């Protein structure tokens, strides 16, 4: 994906960011994120951590928020597939760039992987694990 990896220099900005250098449509990204909430088969978004494991996951929330030049994507789920959050982020960014329509998210949930990109791992930060 286009973009540059930026390493913030400030002591309080030690988390990594995926720098895109373009404006994203945050409202479209949130509309796409809303389609991902609930219980779905996320096989297009990743693979099970166990061979033959199921790919159905319950996503409680996907929140896209923007402040100035920053856009944050937060995902909460009962469990994740390998690579799932990176693919969700990549899909939402493509919708935000207007490279894909909202309906594309529905096709991904239907199992299509056409056009699905993997966001770089550098921009991801695990915030919490709850049991």
Task: Identify the function of each model-found stretch.
Residues 1-131:
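Structured-RNA-binding interfaces characteristic of tRNA pseudouridine synthases
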């Amino acid at each position: 994906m286009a973009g540059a990896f930026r390493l913030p220099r400030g002591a309080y900005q030690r988390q990594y960011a995926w720098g895109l250098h373009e404006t994203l449509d945050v409202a479209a990204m949130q509309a796409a994120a809303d389609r991902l909430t609930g219980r779905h088969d996320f096989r297009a978004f990743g693979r099970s951590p166990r061979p033959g494991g199921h790919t159905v996951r319950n996503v409680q929330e996907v929140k896209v928020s923007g402040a100035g030049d920053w856009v944050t994507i937060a995902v909460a789920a009962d469990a994740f597939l390998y690579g799932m959050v990176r693919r969700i982020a990549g899909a939402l960014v493509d919708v935000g760039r207007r490279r894909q329509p909202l309906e594309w998210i529905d096709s991904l949930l239907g199992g299509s992987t056409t056009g699905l990109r993997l966001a770089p791992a550098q921009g991801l930060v695990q915030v919490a694990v709850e049991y």
